[in-house]
Amino acid sequence: MSEQKPVQWASKIGFVMAAAGSAIGLGAIWKFPYVAGTNGGGAFFLIFVLFTILLGYPLLVGEFIFGRRNQTNAIDAYKKEAPRSAWFLTGWIGVAACFLVLSFYSVIGGWILLYIVKTASGSLSGLSQAQYGALFASIIQNPVQTLAAQLVFMALTVLVVARGVQKGIERVSAVMMPILFLLFILLVLRSLTLNGAMEGVKFLLVPHFGDLTPESILFALGQAFFTLTLGVSVMVTYSSYLPKTQNIPRSAASIVLMNIIVTLLAGLAIFPAVFSFGFQPNEGPTLLFTVLPAVFEQLPFGTLFFIGFLVAFLFAALTSAFSMVEIIVATIGKGDEKKRKKLSWTSGLLIFLVGIPCCLSYGVLSDVHLFGKTFFDIADFTVSNVLMPSGALLISLFIPLKISKSELLAEMRNGSNAGKAFFYTWFYLLRFIVPLAIIIVFLNLIGILSF
């Protein structure tokens, strides 16, 4: 029996698009606008960019090197580098995090789908902001609608992953990502033509460091790691499909740049319009579902532009979801592509079932609390405050401790001409600065360190 040919990306740009799609998820569009809006706007954005470049980029390069070097799923990669040790549990942390993330991430994906349908049908027209708020509450409290939408979102995700890395994830990401960028550019151009739009631009881009607090700086630090899908071995899995000719430092830089650009475009699409019509930029997570519909309502062809925004939002959610299912399939399937379809659908079904309590947290289970939190909040807290930071810390410690500098340099130079100055700057950032930053974020998230 002939051995299966190892799975690889069909092209260099295909990998970049898929990895960027994984990184550019709801964090850049769903979370950043309201976090920036409540933490000083331009000052927060500047700090976020600096942290992304100085801390997120080194860890992303490290995950790429580690993944490509071992050419296998994350758990087996740890076992190859550190046999007969417990380091492989770091890979399982990533698998557990992705499974749990998607259990509530798919709920938000379902909300987006419902909003697209309702906007296209005209159900979201002619309402005030208060009415949009009431409508959003009624939507997320409806168990039948939200569960059906969550199921559709998971089905769309699994349909792509089941087709494989090249024919599924890469091909679809290569279509969705350019469309996402194009939609955001059109939305930004429209938003910037509004009266008073420059107030929103100033809010986003002009730093007011007096508005920064230690808490908001830590927020920016956390955003720099988590918006790149770091710490959950997704990038280790994706890079395991890379050929040795791929320029890792350049690919990582492209992904970081694309993530920053989309974050900037999301801000420029939202804040000028919000300021133009006198709304508050610090409305919280409901900004996208209650404030923006009211803003677009007042624009010529506003419904069309809002649908464009929702489609971009959906594409960002889906391309991230692909990577989360892929790490589960890669781990359990161990490279056996014959098992891919079955594993994809089984994983998707289990994620949906685990996500049911999260989906119902705003409806029939809204009064059910554990440790003072709903099921949705527990899943979010566990991933954001425990699994992702601990996974990122362990990966940042593992790579420079368990792989020699000479081996890391040799792997980095496969496909690139990275000099020693670049390498040693990257290495010492990864070995010392990145773990320290993650520890600070982690201690703050669990309440041990506060300012």
Curated annotation (Swiss-Prot):
Disulfide bond annotation, renumbered to this chain: none
Parts of the chain that traverse the membrane: 13-33, 41-61, 97-117, 142-162, 174-194, 217-237, 255-275, 299-319, 345-365, 381-401, 429-449
Keyword Cell membrane attached: yes
Topology within the bilayer: Multi-pass membrane protein
Recorded family membership: Belongs to the sodium:neurotransmitter symporter (SNF) (TC 2.A.22) family.
Function summary: Putative sodium-dependent transporter.
Protein name: Uncharacterized sodium-dependent transporter YhdH
Source organism: Bacillus subtilis (strain 168)
Name of the coding gene: yhdH
